[in-house]
């Protein structure tokens, strides 16, 4: 009986510890998506109807966005999008398990096969990732018990009629592919150079020179991955509409938002770019962000990615060495 009790306790800890960690860290990732999606032009411009845009004032840092979410939406605002994000992580985490179990057979495990698996996985879950980002940034309150209503709020009429358009969002697939290629090549480079940081005990087996090179390489990597992440968030939250007049798009948006409840009682947490003048592609998104918001916007909260990279590459393996 004691063996059965010990096993039950072990299984409980195995499930509860990752769950608690996930719930504790989710608000930080939710805030980074909100911060990178926030449209903050250097000057106020008129839209096609002659109305002035109203960017969120005072949100010029990651922690300012976190404070704003807390003030306007409360704790619930930090957990927007947790349901689709959980489905996304469950799918991505299941792939290595299926490979180890032999359900998914991979004859060769070289760079190209790893890249192909990563690309296939990300393309499959692309709609869920889009829905997750939109759920995190929407000004509306999404009920947990009514996914149909939430999807109707997050997706445009055109996207609900033609779901495959999510894959064809201008520039989105390019940003996803570049992010996967970049991440796969970085890990392959570390293993090729035989860095102990790519092993289970990085801090114990790394020389100061190796750690220094790794830290510099990770900074360069973040300078590439951060702009890709910003572009991916911006393109994901941009809904697809047919090429019609701006007034028709506005009426469609009003019809879609009927019956919804705003999360913030006073104002929107995130200032989103007008859907009447969308980004036309990957490079157009970069060009407009630079022209309208400045180069620094492409690197907003770059330190967040760097801390996460160091944590997953150095600190986490070091902590695992004690168990």
Predicted regions span which residues?
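Matrix-facing interhelical linker segments
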Residues: 1-323
């Amino acid at each position: 009986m004691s063996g059965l009790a010990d096993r039950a306790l072990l299984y409980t800890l195995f499930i509860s510890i990752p769950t608690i960690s996930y719930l504790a860290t989710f608000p930080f990732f939710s805030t980074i998506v909100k911060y990178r999606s926030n449209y903050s032009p250097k000057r106020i411009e008129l839209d096609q109807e002659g109305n002035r845009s109203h960017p969120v004032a005072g949100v010029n840092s990651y922690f300012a966005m976190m404070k704003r979410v807390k003030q306007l939406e409360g704790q619930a605002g930090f957990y927007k999008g947790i349901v689709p994000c959980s489905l996304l992580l469950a799918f991505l985490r299941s792939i290595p398990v299926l490979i180890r179990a032999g359900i998914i057979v991979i004859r060769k495990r070289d760079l190209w096969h790893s890249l192909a698996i990563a690309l296939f996985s990300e393309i499959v879950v692309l709609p869920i990732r889009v829905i997750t980002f939109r759920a995190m940034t929407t000004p509306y309150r999404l009920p947990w018990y009514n996914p149909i209503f939430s999807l109707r709020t997050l997706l445009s009429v055109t996207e609900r009629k033609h779901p495959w358009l999510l894959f064809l969002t201008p520039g989105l697939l390019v940003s996803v592919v570049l992010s996967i290629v970049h991440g796969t090549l970085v890990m392959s480079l570390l293993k090729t150079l035989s860095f102990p940081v790519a092993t289970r005990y990085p801090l114990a087996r790394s020389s100061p020179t190796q750690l220094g090179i790794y830290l510099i390489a990770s900074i360069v990597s973040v300078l590439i991955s951060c702009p890709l992440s910003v572009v991916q968030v911006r393109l994901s939250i941009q809904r697809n509409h047919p090429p019609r007049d701006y007034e028709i798009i506005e009426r469609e948006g009003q019809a879609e938002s009927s019956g919804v409840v705003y999360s913030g009682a006073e104002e929107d947490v995130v200032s989103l770019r007008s859907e009447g003048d969308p980004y036309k592609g990957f490079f157009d998104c970069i060009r407009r962000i630079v022209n309208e918001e400045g180069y620094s916007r492409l690197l907003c909260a770059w330190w967040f990615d760097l801390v996460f990279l160091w944590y997953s590459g150095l600190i986490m393996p070091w902590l695992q060495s004690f168990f």
